Amino acid sequence: MKKTVTPLRSLCAALAALVLLVALAAPAFAADGFADLYYRMNDSAEVLTEDEDGELEASLEELSVRQSFDVIIATIDSLESEGCTSMEEYADDLYDYCQFGYGENRDGVLLLVSIGDRKWHISTCGYGITAFTDAGIQYLGEQMTPDMADGDYAAAFRTFIQWTDAYVTAAREGHPYDVDNMPKEPFSIVYLG
């Protein structure tokens, strides 16, 4: 007796195979909208203590989830050690390769620090482009570089995290930090007379 396959059974098998293929081809996103592939604190240059690394990873995680905006910090020894010549290119490639970002627009920001080259670069994607203007990035760099120059990378990264929170909040309120809307300098009570 010859066995025949019904068209309905063939259609169901084809659809099941298609669903499986799409599920395997799509990046693995967690329920919260982030790709769940890499740590947000990537200290390849090993400039942080284990405690600092853990503290910063927790801060990046908390901020990213609360703001629905991926915030990443990466250190490298040098561009040469990575076989690259451009901070911008390396930062953008790292962001893409690791599938960082929140949601379909991959909203986020990545700070890359090359220790040996004494350079830093901020890469933005999705809503990060709105929140981090060129003037805002320059201002943020001015806030971080004194600590980096002193070799206190943990302090510089804490500054980056705090300002990133402020930048995203200001942008969501319709006032991203830019040339005509820069953060106000803190009021000093040291000299009042």
Q: Model features per residue range: what roles?
A:
Residues F29-Y191:
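Folded, non-transmembrane soluble domains that reside on the lumenal/extracytoplasmic side of membranes
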Residues K2-L15:
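Bacterial N-terminal signal peptides that target proteins for export
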Residues A13-A25:
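Bacterial N-terminal signal peptides
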Residues A13, V190-G193:
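Hydrophobic H-region at the start of alpha-helical membrane spans
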Residues T6, L20-A23, L48:
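N-terminal non-cleavable signal-anchor helices
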